[in-house]
């Protein structure tokens, strides 16, 4: 079951023949992901990694039946690639690209409404359902199959959490790296809601960071949902000064509720088990599941 991805998901790669697309497509195939082809305009009709290359996403979908796309396209073209995937009927679009202009993403996100496509990212590590399918840039060997769902703004903290959860003897259903940009396709709350409705996911790890209101929105949803699945939360950027961007474009304290302390307070008030250090994620999730 899990969420978003399963072992039969058919995946295409946009920007397939480029350096990044080639490297990560190879890693995905080795993990067991059903990569069925890719898109590079002007190279349609050729093959790459023993898979067909198409000029357009529409051609790729009509030939392969793909329902998932991962995008390794330069920032100036990435928003168009997202919209092209949605137009072609792709249901899950994962955009890895960092540095997409904000106005481009505002347009792309609005465009996706009503298309039936879900966007993960941009500027994200992707999505992985353990032992089934990996659509992203994460090191697959860290993710062991289990019963914990992960939603995170941070790629590396996703990997850290997954490693700790595995070492605690638990493992994950799916990990969703939602991305660290100000405008992203799937919010923390929307990802948490997916896990709340997934019968295989028994607990959730929610990793946020300074900037924006997504964590507070998710926390209030968790409080009001009536769902008793335990949630462990962590907020990165606890020492960040106001007005200083910390890595991600969206990780900047602009107002009082953007700080790590404010977010952690709201999360605790909403019943989330908040940890002060990422080193405590694994043992805390093990503890709350055992209760």
List where the protein language model places each region.
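Catalytic-core regions of core metabolic enzymes
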Residues: 1-291
């Amino acid at each position: 079951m899990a969420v978003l991805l399963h072992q039969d998901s058919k995946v295409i790669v946009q920007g397939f023949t480029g350096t990044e697309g080639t490297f990560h497509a190879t890693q995905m195939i080795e993990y067991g992901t059903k990569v069925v082809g890719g898109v590079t305009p002007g190279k349609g009709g050729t093959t790459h990694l023993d898979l067909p290359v198409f000029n357009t996403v529409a051609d790729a979908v009509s030939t392969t039946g793909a329902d998932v796309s991962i995008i390794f396209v330069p920032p100036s073209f990435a928003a168009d690639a997202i919209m092209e995937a949605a137009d072609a009927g792709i249901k899950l679009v994962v955009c890895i690209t960092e540095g997409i202009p904000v106005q481009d993403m505002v347009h792309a996100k609005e465009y996706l409404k009503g298309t039936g496509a879900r966007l993960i990212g941009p500027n994200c590590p992707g999505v992985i359902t353990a032992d089934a399918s990996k659509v992203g840039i994460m090191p697959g060997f860290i993710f062991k199959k289990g019963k914990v769902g992960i939603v995170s703004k941070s790629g590396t903290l996703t990997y850290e959490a997954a490693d700790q959860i595995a070492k605690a003897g638990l493992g994950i259903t799916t990990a969703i790296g939602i991305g660290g940009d100000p405008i992203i396709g799937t919010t923390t709350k929307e990802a948490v809601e997916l896990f709340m409705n997934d019968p295989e996911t028994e607990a959730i790890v929610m990793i946020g960071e300074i900037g924006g209101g997504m964590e507070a929105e998710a926390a209030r949803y968790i409080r009001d949902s009536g769902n008793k699945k335990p949630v462990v939360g962590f907020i990165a950027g606890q020492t960040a000064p106001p007005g200083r961007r910390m890595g991600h474009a969206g990780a900047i304290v602009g107002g009082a509720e953007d700080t790590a302390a404010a977010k952690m307070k709201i999360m605790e008030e909403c019943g989330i088990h908040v940890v002060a250090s990422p080193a405590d994620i694994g043992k805390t999730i093990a503890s709350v599941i055992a209760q």
